Amino acid sequence: MIRHIVFFTVKPENVEKVRAGLSILTEIPAATRLEIGANVKTDGFHRSIDLVVYGEFEDEAALAAYKAHPLYEESIRRVKPLRDERSAADYVVEDAVTTRV
């Protein structure tokens, strides 16, 4: 399984528009789980993430199918002009450290 996590920073006046643009992604069938969440900002750092996309995919082929879907491109078209920054990470769950090393 692959986890796909994307963080967005957004001006306050654009948060709901970006969330709506990201919500399009939930209609792509390639993900086994896909969530769009707003950061509750309990960390206390000055620069905080505003929105998060969290996805789970069976394998790299499923993630590639997700990124190749026309709705993925539509989401980018809507979100990119409104977001400030975007950071993403993908990792294989079976390779993740789950105990002290």
Regions found by a protein language model. Give the residues of each.
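Short S/T/G/P-rich N-terminal loop/turn motif that feeds into the first structured element of a domain
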Residues: M1-L51, E58-A68, Y91-V101
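Long, contiguous binding/interaction regions
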Residues: A68, E73-E74
